[in-house]
Curated annotation (Swiss-Prot):
GO terms for cellular component: plasma membrane. It holds the Pfam family Transpeptidase. SUPFAM superfamilies: beta-lactamase/transpeptidase-like (SSF56601). It comes from the Bacteria. It comes from Pseudomonas aeruginosa. The gene is bla. Residues 1-20 form the signal peptide. Belongs to the class-D beta-lactamase family. GO terms for biological process: antibiotic catabolic process; cell wall organization; response to antibiotic. The modification N6-carboxylysine is found at K70. Keywords: Antibiotic resistance, Hydrolase, Signal. The active site is at S67 (acyl-ester intermediate). This is Beta-lactamase OXA-19.
């Protein structure tokens, strides 16, 4: 495996055990430069409690979580009883939706896998502002600002979270240490499995706020963790986006970096 941090600058970004300090690995920037992308990748190794990033400043900058918020939204839905269990089916009302893959009945796992916005908007409406606010505080999730509308605050309004905070939240979920039942955390973790390779398992979620403009770009995310043997790697990637054709880069850039670190296949 290549060295985890070839060029190192250390900065304290958080008081948590996983990301109390983070090192800057500028060698990863070549993957961003090759695609003319402004973005950040944070990668943390659980056993050594070590984290690295290509961009220290951006790693702690907060952005709209977009559909990565489906992770806490699902847990909160289960905790409040809005989602009865992992077998609940969310019925399609037959009305046209923005994406054809949303136009069907969906399980919780299915709704997460296809990132069905209408399903999670309904969950948020049923949870309500008071309970939503309570759980975001319990989870220490981003800036915890849900103003602007209960069914859109994570899509276009004031909620913000950094890449560092994303990996902190994901570690707590992995360890079943969120202020939620172990059973409900396990349900959501299972729903997040996106790749099961012979040597590793990936749990992840994408997010996309829209393309924006060159002067005011949107944000695209990929966050999750990789289980490989006895090791766990937590990751969070975000990038500016002003052209939807660049959307696949939210996964291809971090995949190349993790492949270069010997974590997953390229």
């Amino acid at each position: 495996m290549k060295t985890f941090a070839a060029y190192v600058i250390t900065a304290c970004l958080s008081s948590t055990a996983l990301a109390s300090s983070i090192t800057e690995n500028t060698s990863w920037n070549k993957e961003f430069s090759a695609e003319a992308v402004n973005g950040v990748f944070v990668l943390c190794k659980s056993s050594s409690k070590s984290c690295a990033t290509n961009n220290l400043a951006r790693a702690s900058k907060e952005y709209l979580p977009a559909s990565t918020f489906k992770i806490p939204n699902a847990i909160i839905g289960l905790e409040t009883g809005v989602i009865k269990n992992e077998h609940q089916v969310f019925k399609w009302d037959g009305k046209p939706r923005a994406m054809k893959q949303w136009e069907r009945d969906l399980s919780l796992r299915g709704a997460i896998q296809v990132s069905a916005v209408p399903v999670f908007q309904q969950i948020a409406r049923e949870v309500g502002e008071v309970r939503m606010q309570k759980y975001l505080k319990k989870f220490s999730y981003g800036n915890q600002n849900i103003s602007g509308g209960i069914d859109k605050f994570w899509l276009e309004d004031q909620l913000r979270i950094s890449a560092v905070n994303q990996v902190e939240f994901l570690e707590s979920l992995f360890l079943n240490k969120l202020s939620a039942s172990k059973e409900n955390q396990l349900i959501v973790k299972e729903a997040l499995v996106t790749e099961a390779a012979p040597e590793y398992l990936v749990h992840s979620k994408t997010g996309f706020s829209g393309v924006g403009t060159e002067s005011n770009p949107g944000v695209a995310w990929w966050v999750g963790w990789v289980e490989k043997g006895t090791e766990v790697y937590f990751f969070a990637f975000n990038m500016d986006i002003d052209n939807e054709n660049k959307l696949p880069l939210r996964k291809s850039i971090p995949t190349k970096i993790m492949a270069s670190e010997g974590i997953i296949g390229g």
